[in-house]
A protein has these predicted regions:
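Beta-strand-rich, repetitive solenoid scaffolds
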Residues: 1-7, 12-17, 21-28, 32-46, ...
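Terminal beta-strand-rich extracellular "head" domains
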Residues: 94, 118-180, 186-187
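Hydrophobic residues positioned within well-ordered beta-strands of beta-sheet architectures
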Residues: 114, 136, 216-220
Length: 226
């Protein structure tokens, strides 16, 4: 092994171990990083690689760009996973959310995938019949982009259990849609007569003291603002 220096390369470590060329240990004599003899890969054997500054990450700038279009960034600067609480809401309404409410999310870069279930758990009050129903509580604000890359992305929606039905069989939602610059989803269905996609309304919810009602399962992927 040798330690050298050149004006161009700076400090040079040259290892010649039978197993590893470079081994870094902590004060407890635990190996935390190593490079195999003759190898070029760096292995972190204990702990994690921690980005100490927000917005920094792994830069894939050495890779080729797209075959069509133009790349704007090759920096992977975020990963996160966790839970969130989706709840029904409608302007002016008081809605008691049910016991079958919960969700999970995963964020890779600015791409967010959420899944969840939500329901109502009691009688509702206030509200206006024609006002849209929302699922609120998204973990990240939807990107406010109007150029096409994030124009109201849609996801899957299912009301699996008929025992927890909605008020009108024909108006049960089948799609969730993210809304630019917001932290909620809209629900919608295809009208049986006109075939148009219509936002689910407050009067589409089944008003019942039973728990749960209006049970729904959903997932959606969208681009986050940050």
């Amino acid at each position: 092994a040798a330690i050298g220096y050149t004006a161009a390369e700076g400090l040079i470590l040259t290892g010649q171990g039978s197993t590893d060329d470079v081994t870094i240990k902590n004060d407890a004599d635990t190996t935390v990083l190593q490079v195999a003899t003759g190898g070029v890969d760096v292995e972190i054997t204990a702990g994690n690689l921690i980005m100490g500054t927000s917005g920094k990450g792994i830069d894939f700038g050495a890779t080729a760009g797209p075959t069509a279009g133009s790349g704007t960034s090759e920096l992977l600067d975020d990963y996160e996973e966790g839970t969130w609480t989706p709840v029904y809401a409608s302007t002016g309404a008081t809605i008691t959310n049910g016991s079958t409410t919960g969700g999970a999310y995963r964020k890779i870069g600015s791409l967010v995938t959420v899944q969840g279930s939500t329901s109502t758990g009691g009688a509702m009050s206030g509200g206006t019949a024609g006002n849209p129903v929302r699922i609120e509580g998204l973990p990240f604000t939807v990107d406010d982009d109007t150029s096409g890359e994030n124009m109201r992305p849609t996801g899957n929606f299912d009301t699996w259990n008929s025992s927890y039905q909605w008020a009108e069989d024909g108006d049960q939602p089948s799609v969730v849609s993210a809304v630019n610059n917001q932290v909620y989803l809209y629900l919608s269905y295809r009208d049986a007569v006109d075939k148009y996609r219509i936002d689910t309304r407050f009067d589409d919810l089944q008003d019942s003291s039973s728990n749960p009602r209006n049970l729904a399962y959903f997932s959606i992927t969208y681009i986050a603002a940050t």
